[in-house]
Swiss-Prot record:
Species: Thermobifida fusca (strain YX)
HAMAP family xref list: Ribosomal_uL4_B
Lineage of source species: Bacteria, Bacillati, Actinomycetota, Actinomycetes, Streptosporangiales
Name by which UniProt lists this protein: Large ribosomal subunit protein uL4
Top-level taxonomic group: Bacteria
InterPro entries, sorted: Ribosomal_uL4 (IPR002136), Ribosomal_uL4-like (IPR013005), Ribosomal_uL4_dom_sf (IPR023574)
Family: Belongs to the universal ribosomal protein uL4 family.
Amino acid sequence: MATIEVKDREGAAKGSVELPDEIFAQKVNIPLIHQVVVAQQAAGRQGTHSTKTRGEVRGGGKKPYRQKGTGRARQGSVRAPQFTGGGTVHGPKPRDYAQRTPKKMKAAALRGALSNRAQHGRIHVVSEFVPEDVTTKRTQTALKTLRKITDSDKVLVVLSREDQHNRLALRNLPEVHILDANQVNTYDVLYADDIVFTEAGYQEFLAHAKGSKIAASQEDDQ
């Protein structure tokens, strides 16, 4: 079982935590991860797009000219698809893009994504970003702490659900995406260059992982 250092606000080691093998040392299944990420992105689509067919466009009930004798092609409505202002043929209609993904697949994909980040040294744990007694320039203080940990432009910060102090300090930083410990997902882990847990957030994540069977045994996946 691997361990990583817990850094303080100055970037110095103040302890260590273990990275459980059942979460951070698993096989990276790229096709599975791709399937889960695509499903997650699809679920975020609104699917409210809509176009009108010739039967739904207002007007066009009158035949524009007689059937025969004009030398022109016969037409029955000015709302036919070939006319400007006419209906759309096979256009998009409202639909649900959500794909059903089994929980075990989501869990295995997340384990693979976290394992990849751990193998490349992109998992970090910090005691805190801002002390509780700091009430001014919190964002500046939090950014200074973050830069002692990583220089990445895309950072996923995982906080304890109750940690409002650090959340308020970090939320306006454009390079930071904040998640609660129970919201960690495959897409956000892969999108970020580095993942930084607070110490409390890391312990909460491990508890949630075991409770939701993210740390399921290998036998369950086979």
